[in-house]
Amino acid sequence: MDCSFITTNDLRRMFKTLDKNQDGLVTLDELLWILDKLGWAEHTPDELELIVGKQSLDLDEFLRFYYDAVLDSKGSKKNIDVVADNDEAIARAFNVFDVNGDGYISAEELRDVLERLGFEEEAKAWDCGRMIRVHDKNLDGFVDFEEFKNMILHV
């Protein structure tokens, strides 16, 4: 699995992990938990309910919420595999992976974020260092914003 960005399949696995009672729904509390892990918990539960309009989301609604609200893209139910194409949305995604805020993504930061998202086993198996090397065009051992942006726009 390519770990260069959060894919729809990754989101499906996150949804399954969050759906602890396996009822096919993710509650607002579970949604707030994942937003907090991503560093995007800027809303109270009441505010989130106003945004979402209900107490829980099914898988399609969860995917749309992620792409519409988190990445500010125009994903739809039929075409949900959308990667944000504007600098602001890409910067927000970059900042999730740039854990220490130094302007660079290291293999360790990538691995840490994957683990925070509930992909502990996959993060150990994936070669995040190789992914960094593939997209590290200036060969400094990190992915900077421009390299990240080029990676996202050319996937």
UniProtKB/Swiss-Prot annotation:
Ca(2+) 2 binds at D98, N100, D102, Y104, E109. Gene3D superfamilies: EF-hand (1.10.238.10). Ca(2+) 1 binds at D19, N21, D23, E30. Transmembrane segments: none annotated. GO terms for biological process: cellular response to hypoxia. One of its GO terms (molecular function) is calcium ion binding. This is Probable calcium-binding protein CML44. It comes from the Eukaryota.
